Amino acid sequence: MTSCVAEEPIKKIAIFGGTHGNELTGVFLVTHWLKNGAEVHRAGLEVKPFITNPRAVEKCTRYIDCDLNRVFDLENLSKEMSEDLPYEVRRAQEINHLFGPKNSDDAYDVVFDLHNTTSNMGCTLILEDSRNDFLIQMFHYIKTCMAPLPCSVYLIEHPSLKYATTRSIAKYPVGIEVGPQPHGVLRADILDQMRRMLKHALDFIQRFNEGKEFPPCAIDVYKIMEKVDYPRNESGDVAAVIHPNLQDQDWKPLHPGDPVFVSLDGKVIPLGGDCTVYPVFVNEAAYYEKKEAFAKTTKLTLNAKSIRSTLH
């Protein structure tokens, strides 16, 4: 008999929009739900929509002083509060106070953090822990409900790449990333896709709380391997751009020798190494400053045990 994991019922959920102030789908949806939350209301659940970086939203910029989605590490969260701290670090401490504290029993059960990308990634769920049966089950449910529209899972578990995301204060952190959409722009198709992903996620939680047992499942995920910078000249400036064959080909297999970059004089730079990879965040606008042209991932399968709520 397959073992069933009994999990505590979910009680508190937050929906974050505006972690990056120019990614407008989450801003638009959360602002709407703050005025009328009927769409995200679920019986027996506390669901709190929240604008995480209001100053950046007001200016329609990614951030004010630094990236809010990279400062939720214990070092920043424990710094003594002062006006000298970057705005986003102060804001992170406020958010941690409201929805955390991180790694504590009082923290919110689930945080959905809504993002857009300029890359052609479609519907993407971001997973931080490959051993989390509850989230693998949730993602399987969302993927099944979204079909035939693809919904990819990006696993950012890595020994040296530490993200310290806004959502990481929750017991179950969920990144929802939908693109392509230019920053500072709203697209109806992207809006609809994100809305549907969140609906299915909330439905899953409600069914789980009501006692439904979810049988064992498996999902394909794309696990981060490394980030690839643009070729640069001696001054540190970008010396080549994403090759047309790679542009908009997120999640597609990229083989050694395939063209990756092309310079102004027509020089083609191929993929090195000896293994096939799957690129994501290809030519993401916000990652130029992070010196990231794309991320290499490897494709693998994650399995989850059967789960049910301890109340049933």
From Swiss-Prot:
This is Aspartoacylase. Keywords: Cytoplasm, Hydrolase, Metal-binding, Nucleus, Zinc. It comes from Rattus norvegicus. It catalyses: an N-acyl-L-aspartate + H2O = a carboxylate + L-aspartate; N-acetyl-L-aspartate + H2O = L-aspartate + acetate. Its cofactor is Zn(2+). Binds 1 zinc ion per subunit. The gene is Aspa. Signal peptide: none annotated. It is found in: Cytoplasm; Nucleus. The keyword Nucleotide-binding does not apply. It comes from the Eukaryota. Detected in kidney proximal tubule cells (at protein level). The record marks R62 as: Transition state stabilizer. Homodimer. Its EC number is 3.5.1.15. N-acetyl-L-aspartate binds at R62, N69, R70, Y163, R167, Y287. The active site is at E177. GO terms for cellular component: cytosol; nucleus. Zn(2+) binds at H20, E23, H115. Catalyzes the deacetylation of N-acetylaspartic acid (NAA) to produce acetate and L-aspartate. NAA occurs in high concentration in brain and its hydrolysis NAA plays a significant part in the maintenance of intact white matter. In other tissues it acts as a scavenger of NAA from body fluids. GO terms for molecular function: aspartoacylase activity; hydrolase activity, acting on carbon-nitrogen (but not peptide) bonds, in linear amides; hydrolase activity, acting on ester bonds; identical protein binding; metal ion binding. HAMAP family: Aspartoacylase (MF_00704).
